[in-house]
């Protein structure tokens, strides 16, 4: 190919192409196709300009080379082929004298007749694809684009071809000749296939086969293939683009990009009001389990059988009393509901054969607690659209709540280790490939760090409760079914253990849509006295139902046992996600993996073993008012898992909004820390968007308080 180029092109063009490749550090002995492409492009630019002049009247004329005429001015200024510094000098000079807008990229020519810069393209592919790439890269309506192909096709901005038919035909003929000459030497196929879209300096990673098809399928709308998208991304200029878009929107909008300095950000304002309350679907750190070890009773594994067996392990039941009423509820109904559960469990035990499921009698207290007949009657819109005062019922704004320390305590507890194992090591077949070996090694190390974690208990508890509730909602739609809240684990010694946390009673559940609500009453055992933090238990009615003997350093002590009762609701879509809470393990494992990968790429070897076994090393876990908290790799695993689990337990629109908006501020602060001199506009609007998500959700308020700690330390 190199020999062909030297024979086929004018020596001046070859010399300019050599210079250009040298400037970009490319070897023409290796990049022979690129060498040919640069020469072709240069020749087309020169042919475009050749013989075109402007006469004294300012008209464009064509003068053949033998016509000596010194008074004529060249119609086109050639920018292509000059070294970069000189080329920009020419561009700046043209802009200063003609008032043309300065282009972001070096164009190829300037047309003095039409007063516009021109970008010339020569492509071995389809002209419209290459045209799009050029347009996406340049993003300027002022620069005119003209694309030629080796097949005689052309495409230009607004179909304005600038030159006369004959001049363009000369260029097309020359390109066709080059193609034939290459083909006769067996060089054309390689040259045609080597075009990589809008050229950038760095090497492209070629994608082929299935990955190529998948890449083309997963593009945003309006992009036909990965090259188009790459060209668009390569030429993307965020600041100019934002300012330009805003000025298009309205003449009044003026986006001034302000520098973002250490003194710029202020803390996020947390709302004032009464303290926030517990809103998870089941108790977390305050739950109490009635457990049986090595269960082998008849019907073991059937929830109702397991629950009755667990209930029999406790002998301290007493007459229940309300110790913390629910402010807005009818508390005697909650009391009667618990008594009814006890009675109906007694009735089951006296039966000859215990049933697999238990439907509660539809008593007045349960009907009240489950909101039976409380929903307003639904009327078809067509039947009432003529009603003159038809309106949607008013809904009150949610009351603002302030941050409360109990949610930080909940999170700390979720990161702790328990004395039980909550997940088994998945038994997966022999590793076949080295990468599988590394993956299973990482999974095993990670599992060992989190299998005892309380957050893992919450996962298994959540999966069980949501699965049982969704099953019952579909199988017994009209029944008030009693659903035991159960989990299974192993002791440190490896003995199996079944735990009962309490019960759920499900209301009517004709769930047609994903968001249709099923009401339920939850009744959960606890040793936590609700009077210590009454604000946390605002939505609960708490009963004292027994006394439990506990072993302590000073012997056995008796502690009151409480029952936390509340009405709650969930939907098919929420239960579906609750059933998939095991995904939290995967998410946190992937976060740990990216840390290992970063370490491995620095050391140029797999660092999995060192990562988990080097106990002396500490890692950043989070930020507290005292500064950056650090801990062992196990603590990092458990903290990441707890965050993922709490995102699932406390999922809400407030969390979605806060996460999305605060992330923007986080990225700006990180850019500042990395000395990237970030600029912003409408920072006040961003703070507004963040703060409108801070209403009453405890997990969102905790995240906001963490974010403020991060801001304080990041900007010191």
UniProtKB/Swiss-Prot annotation:
GO terms for cellular component: host cell cytoplasm; host cell nucleus. Mn(2+) 1 binds at residues 41, 108, 119-120. A motif (Nuclear localization signal 2 (NLS2)) lies at residues 184-247. It is an enzyme of class 3 (hydrolase). Mn(2+) 2 binds at residues 80, 108. Binds 2 manganese ions per subunit. Keywords: Cap snatching, Endonuclease, Eukaryotic host gene expression shutoff by virus, Eukaryotic host transcription shutoff by virus, Host cytoplasm, Host gene expression shutoff by virus, Host nucleus, Host-virus interaction, Hydrolase, Inhibition of host RNA polymerase II by virus, Manganese, Metal-binding, Nuclease, Phosphoprotein. A motif (Nuclear localization signal 1 (NLS1)) lies at residues 124-139. This is Polymerase acidic protein. It comes from Influenza A virus (strain A/USA:Texas/UR06-0195/2007 H1N1). The lineage of its organism: Viruses, Riboviria, Orthornavirae, Negarnaviricota, Polyploviricotina. The gene is PA.
